[in-house]
C-alpha cells in the first residue's frame, strides 16, 4: 500500500472488564500500524476503566492512545464524542466486548484506498460463545451488501455488518452524527449514510 492514512479506532466502553483487554489487544496488534485509538469509558460501575487503562499504559508505543472516563451519557453520546475527537481519514468502532482479526484494518484501508466510489466497507463476523468457541458466521454474502443499498436496508434485504465496518470520517460532514434520541442508533446512521453514499463489501470474516 503506497499510502498509510491515519485510522481512528473508537471504543465506547461500558461494563466489560472481562472482555476489554482482548478487545484492545486486537486493536494494538493490528498489522496496520498508523492507528489512533480513542477509548471513552461511559461511567462503568465495574473496573472496566482501570483494566483498560492499565493495559494501554503498559504498551510500549502508546502515544496515539487516548483513554478517559466520565459520568454515564449513553452509547450515542459516547460514539459522537469519539467521532468529534477523531483525526483519522477513516474511522471504525469496535464494541468493548468484540475483537478483530489482525488484518482487519489493513485489508479494509486497502479496499477503500482502491475504491474511491465507496464511503464505507464492511465484512463478515465469526460468532463465538463465552469460551471463544466458534458457533457460526454472520455472513452478509447472501444479502444486498454493496453499492446502493439504501432501499435494501429499508425492506430488510440488505444491510451493513456493524462489528466489521470502516468508513471515511468525512461522511459526518454530510450526514451528521449518531442520534441520541433513538434506541437503534446504528440502523438510523446506516440509513442516512447509504442514502448519500455507496458501500463496499469484502466476503471474509474480520471480526468476532
What are these regions (language model features)?
Residues 84, 123, 142-208:
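Conserved nucleotide-sugar donor-binding catalytic segment
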Residues 91:
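Short aromatic/hydrophobic "clamp" motif used to bind/position activated sugar donors
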Residues 103-136:
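Conserved donor NDP-sugar-binding/catalytic core segment of glycosyltransferases
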